[in-house]
């Protein structure tokens, strides 16, 4: 029974899943939007939104927790200085998932684009 087991396994080991979502979260924070499968986008939202909430607190402990999750000092600085200030007055819902019309060519997987809802983020500052 799968009672209280949240999250998709995506046919990967736990370490592979952790690395996949760490890389996807880093790319989303770096570029502002990425295209991926619909299932991965929905799971990525569960990782990125708490990171932005953490960045809104803007203290040393929050930075250390964000680095623990992201693993890159430059991206942590970008998250805290550029991404989070755009969401100061937003109570939640920092990302938007848009389903794309075309499916992936190889396996016909449903694709989606995940992006930040606020577009005032400067991508060039990394």
Curated annotation (Swiss-Prot):
Keyword Cell membrane attributed: no
GO biological process, one term: translation
Keywords for this protein: Ribonucleoprotein, Ribosomal protein
Gene3D superfamilies associated with the record: Ribosomal protein L17 (3.90.1030.10)
One MF annotation (Gene Ontology) recorded for this entry: structural constituent of ribosome
Coiled-coil ranges from the UniProt annotation: none
Pfam families named in the record: Ribosomal_L17
Top-rank taxon: Bacteria
SUPFAM superfamilies with a match to the protein in the record: Prokaryotic ribosomal protein L17 (SSF64263)
One annotated Gene Ontology cellular component of this protein: cytosolic large ribosomal subunit
Family: Belongs to the bacterial ribosomal protein bL17 family.
Alphabetical list of HAMAP family matching this protein: Ribosomal_bL17 (MF_01368)
Subunit description: Part of the 50S ribosomal subunit. Contacts protein L32.
Name by which UniProt lists this protein: Large ribosomal subunit protein bL17
């Amino acid at each position: 029974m799968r009672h209280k087991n949240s999250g998709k396994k995506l046919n990967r080991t736990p370490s592979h899943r952790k690395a996949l979502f760490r890389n996807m979260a880093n790319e989303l924070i770096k570029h502002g939007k990425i295209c991926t499968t619909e299932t991965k986008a929905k799971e990525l939202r569960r990782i990125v939104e708490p990171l932005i909430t953490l960045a809104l607190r803007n203290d040393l402990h929050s930075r250390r927790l964000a680095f623990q999750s992201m693993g890159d000092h430059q991206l942590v600085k970008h998250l805290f200085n550029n991404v989070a200030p755009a969401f100061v007055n937003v109570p939640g819902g920092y990302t938007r998932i848009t389903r794309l019309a075309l499916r992936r060519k190889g396996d016909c997987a449903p694709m989606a684009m995940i992006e930040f809802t606020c577009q005032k983020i400067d991508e060039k500052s990394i």
